[in-house]
């Protein structure tokens, strides 16, 4: 019997099985399909959610993070196919991306998770600067707060704004005031221009 080989994943830096890599590539394919040509705002989270249904670009239903984000943006899912909903998100010039493109393994402690984020940050910033090229970055994960000094305007090559959204921490739910602040941040960013 062959011993499974674990290799570092390009998307998150964690040691990964073939299934992990296949799942990352599937999610990358889903996200690429709805990537706008000109990205007005990149919504940056710490890591991808565990469940595919929580992953915004999944063809499944929009639950968890995906549902909360769409609600915060005022994008209705009622009576629409996932393609119609994602096309609306795309038309707004928005992209949701994660510093770690894969979920953090469940047995990873907080210090290990932070080390993963710090280690993968240069690669993620290079991707933002060279490939995505957004007009602005909106950091929405509270877990990225300790990396704020590394996420300055010069690192991604565009203005960086912080409006933490608790839904991107699996153990918290966003409250009404947080949703209102998040909704208010997007038009303000658009008015800033670059």
State where each predicted segment sits:
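Short, flexible loop segments at boundaries between secondary-structure elements
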Residues: 71-78, 156-190
């Amino acid at each position: 019997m062959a011993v499974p080989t674990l290799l570092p994943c390009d998307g998150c830096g964690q040691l990964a099985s073939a299934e992990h890599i296949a799942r990352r590539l599937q999610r990358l394919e889903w996200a690429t399909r709805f990537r706008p040509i000109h990205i007005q705002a990149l919504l940056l989270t710490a890591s991808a959610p565990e469940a595919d249904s929580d992953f915004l670009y999944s063809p499944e239903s929009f639950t968890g993070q995906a549902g909360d984000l769409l609600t915060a943006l005022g994008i209705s899912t009622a009576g629409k196919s996932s393609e119609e909903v994602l096309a609306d998100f795309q038309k707004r010039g928005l992209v949701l991306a994660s510093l770690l493109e894969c979920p953090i393994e469940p047995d990873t402690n907080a210090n290990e998770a932070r080390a993963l984020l710090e280690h993968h940050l240069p690669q993620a910033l290079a991707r933002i600067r060279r490939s995505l090229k957004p007009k602005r970055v909106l950091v929405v994960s509270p877990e990225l707060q300790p990396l704020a000094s590394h996420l300055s305007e010069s690192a991604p090559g565009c203005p960086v704004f912080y409006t933490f959204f608790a839904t991107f921490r699996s153990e918290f739910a966003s409250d009404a005031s947080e949703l209102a602040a998040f909704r208010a941040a997007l038009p303000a960013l658009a008015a800033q221009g670059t």
